[in-house]
């Protein structure tokens, strides 16, 4: 089965961020903003390293009590955030998708 890919983008404010997309094109993880493209690339490397490890995920609820999850690096810093899901089961399926697709080495640079 095909893995997803990462997309690096430049925001209007000049900062960089990335999304991890599943093979169906759906965004399954989004990063914070980074001051440089190199920092965003380091963030991708951290997702690639940490995404296979279930212990690096934390299931949370937003203000509407909708479940979502964060992926944390070994230093406990958040390196990616999911969308909101309809149920904890759906969020856990999202974690499983990031665990699989996070290993992708395909990075599409949309800043060029």
Curated annotation (Swiss-Prot):
Source organism of this protein record: Yersinia pestis
Protein name as annotated: UPF0339 protein YegP
InterPro entries found in the cross-reference section: DUF1508, UPF0339_domain, YegP-like_sf
Similarity section: Belongs to the UPF0339 family. Duplicated subfamily.
Keyword Repeat: yes
Domain of life: Bacteria
Start and stop residues of the Sequence repeats: 11-59, 62-110
A Pfam family assignment: DUF1508
Keywords for this protein: Repeat
């Amino acid at each position: 089965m095909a893995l997803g890919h990462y997309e690096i983008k430049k925001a209007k404010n000049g900062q960089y961020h990335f999304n991890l997309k599943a093979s169906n094109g759906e965004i399954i993880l989004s990063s914070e903003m980074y001051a440089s493209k190199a920092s965003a690339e380091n963030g991708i490397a951290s997702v690639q390293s940490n995404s296979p490890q279930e212990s690096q995920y934390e299931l949370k609820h937003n203000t509407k009590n909708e479940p979502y999850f964060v992926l944390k690096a070994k230093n406990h810093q958040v390196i990616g955030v999911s969308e909101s899901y309809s149920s904890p089961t759906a969020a856990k399926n999202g974690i499983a998708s990031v665990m699989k697709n996070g290993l992708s080495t395909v990075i599409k640079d949309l800043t060029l």
